[in-house]
Regions:
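Thiamine diphosphate
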Residues: 1-136, 164, 231-233, 259, 398-532, 542-543, ...
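Short acidic, glycine/serine/threonine-rich loops at helix termini
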Residues: 35-38, 61-63, 84-88, 110-117, ...
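Conserved thiamine diphosphate
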Residues: 107-156, 162, 189-194, 200, ...
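Short beta-alpha connecting loops at secondary-structure transitions
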Residues: 46-47, 105-109, 126-131, 284, ...
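A glycine-rich helix N-cap at a beta->alpha junction
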Residues: 44-52, 94-105, 182-190, 452-465, ...
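Flexible, low-complexity linker and terminal segments
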Residues: 1-9, 19, 133, 137-363, ...
Length: 604
């Protein structure tokens, strides 16, 4: 063993590698992305690593490998599990031969997600065991144990770190490479009575699942990561039940105090019933400190009824704990003070509060998406139109002054929502904006639906040749894989033509006049058509010469600021200035300026 300073996601990856991982697949999404990327960096060639087209593809690939006896891991964020739930629900009934861990990173807050959904609920829904780590060291150790449980009980298991565990750092003890487990898959053994899902088999396996989970309920009551921290005062009649990062916050707040007993739940499903009952006995009240849903709270309420225990369970359901958002040491301290009758902690305030302006997220300076949105906005000026957005950097197109995203639901939804709006408002020109990675992940089926059902819509693909928002991962259109292989690019143009979209035009959005003309030419044609705005992500290319303002020509109309919202254009002493450190020389502002006062940029 040796010590390393690791991010939580890196620790999870290193733990999986140490457990004999053979295959890892996934789709990038904060806060899970670094798990797969770290695995790839520490791959000696014995692990197959793949960024899949979407989470469903990743799940099915990993399942196939697990059927062969391989140890596999699938990585995604919590909303990715919605995409992967179809194969997962059936896989729960079929089972696996090799250990299979489905890593789903939850995002309390949410910090970078559409929802605050709780994967612990999905565990109970799918009847799959779930592991909920409370810190970086535990995440490293627990992922190895998760593989062992999965393999022993022939079932996929869910592994559910949250954002603060994923992105937290700690010095932890890790195995030396010589101590890594080496797993040699047996290979696929044909057995249609096991691997082919039919109603009769599902019925039989459902019974086996229930029996297995009853067994695991007992096993997890003795699992070392589920534990009771005894009260400092044996006569204390109050207790705390918690989990995950909230357990770490709780122990930090209680440090040095006369603390009540604490129940730590590391496996929310199957719930460690016997351990929980042992904890509840003799207590008058228990406060449940949880993020997201009241999973532990509801389990304890159920157990009090089942075993006729008089303990009062408090938490989210009793409005003693906030119903939404993430916890913190401060929020936990406040909740504990109210529950235990301690003096409320004074709010820490700096002597001189910093006067910081609000800084909402914006598209980067030089981002081609800004030009794409602006081109469509210019072309549709005065026309009745709806702009359906999607998940990615380009969701920021909803911000002023662009104001070009009217809807955003989930990945790929904009393509289909556009069709629905068009059916109700046939006189409205409907656009669906989608990124190149999202196109491959979840928009193609929607486009097939549009062609088949004769929709009237315009698909706008914002193609910057990368999965930008999550850290520039490759996708099928980039011609590169996560293993570093150079492969044939999957052409968006050819794909659209192949499914029957007859009008597909490609244009560089930074050539503004051409882009506006393209939109006017394409958008008003009947039927399904597509515009591909193709220009590389500004973060990945070398910046050109920054723009310059010729003050003798500048009339201070501020059109460049009012219409574009580029962070590279600022007001200084009442005058428009170019922020040289940010400007990439994209030239968009030069093309917007009515007096040609901006020059020096590469596209101007």
């Amino acid at each position: 063993m040796h010590t390393e300073f690791l991010m939580g996601n890196a620790a999870i990856a290193m733990g999986a590698v140490a457990a004999g991982l053979n295959v890892v697949s996934g789709y990038p999404g904060t806060p899970s992305t670094e798990v797969l990327e770290t695995t790839a960096r520490h791959n000696d060639g014995s692990i197959y690593v793949e960024w899949s087209a979407n989470e469903k593809a990743a799940m099915e690939l990993a399942a196939g490998a697990a059927y062969c006896g391989a140890r596999t891991m699938v990585t995604m964020k919590q909303v990715g599990l919605n995409v992967a739930s179809d194969p997962l629900m059936s896989l729960a009934y079929i089972g696996v031969k090799g250990g299979m861990v489905v890593l789903v990173a939850d995002d309390p807050g949410p910090i970078s997600s559409q929802t605050e959904q709780d994967t612990r609920r999905f565990a109970a829904f799918s009847k799959l065991p779930c592991f909920d780590p409370s810190g970086v060291q535990e995440a490293y150790d627990m992922i190895q144990e998760a593989f062992a449980y999965s393999e022993k009980y022939h079932t996929p298991v869910l592994f559910r770190p949250t954002t603060r565990v994923c992105h937290g750092y700690a010095s932890i003890q890790v195995k030396d490479k010589a101590d890594y487990l080496v797993n040699q898959p047996e290979g696929f053994v044909k057995d249609s009575s096991k691997w082919v899902i039919f109603p009769r088999l599902s019925y039989q396996n459902h019974i086996r699942m229930e029996e297995r989970n009853e067994q695991l309920q007992e096993v997890f009551s003795g699992y070392e990561r589920n534990c009771i921290r005894p009260a400092a005062d044996p006569g204390c009649k109050k207790g705390i039940a918690t989990h995950g990062i909230s357990y770490a916050y709780t122990m930090e707040v209680l440090h040095g105090k006369s603390a009540p007993g604490v129940l730590k739940v590391a496996t929310p499903f199957p719930f460690p019933e016997q351990l929980a009952v042992e904890f509840l006995q003799g207590l008058d009240e228990v406060l449940c400190l949880e993020e997201l849903d009241p999973v532990i709270e509801q389990e304890l309420v159920y157990l009090c009824g089942k075993y006729h225990l008089p303990t009062k369970i408090r938490g989210k359901l009793t409005h003693d704990v906030a119903p939404a958002g993430e916890n913190s040491c401060d929020s936990v301290a406040k909740d504990l003070a109210a529950f235990l009758g301690w003096e409320q902690p004074a709010a820490a305030a700096p002597e001189t509060p910093p006067q910081l302006p609000v800084r909402p997220p914006v598209l980067c300076a030089g981002c081609p998406h800004r030009a794409s949105f602006f081109a469509v906005k210019e072309a549709m000026k005065g026309k009745k139109s709806v702009f359906c957005g999607d998940i990615g950097c380009y969701t920021l197109g909803n911000a002023m002054p662009l104001d070009m995203v009217d809807t955003c639901l989930c990945m790929g939804a904009g393509v289909n929502m556009t069709q629905g709006i068009g059916k109700i408002e046939p006189d409205t020109t409907c656009f669906a904006f989608v990124g190149d990675s999202t196109f491959f992940a979840s928009a193609i089926t929607g486009m097939v639906n549009a062609v088949y059902n004769q929709a009237n819509m315009t698909l706008v693909v914002l193609d910057n040749s990368t999965t930008a928002m999550t850290g520039h991962q490759p996708h099928p259109g980039t011609g590169k894989t996560m293993m570093g292989q150079v492969v044939d690019k999957v052409s968006i143009v050819d794909t659209l033509h192949g499914i029957g979209v007859k009008t597909v035009e490609t244009v560089d959005p930074l050539h503004l006049k051409e882009a506006v003309a393209c939109v006017k030419r394409v958008a008003f044609q009947p039927g399904v058509k597509a515009i591909i705005f193709k220009s590389p992500c500004a973060v990945l290319i070398k910046s050109g010469k920054p723009a310059e303002i010729e003050e003798s020509k500048c009339i201070q109309c501020k059109k460049c600021i009012r219409t574009l919202g580029c962070p590279g254009i600022i007001l200084q002493d009442g005058k428009v200035r170019i922020e040289q450190a940010l400007c990439t020389g994209c030239g968009l502002c030069a093309q917007v300026c009515p007096t040609q006062a901006i020059g020096g940029a590469c596209h101007a």
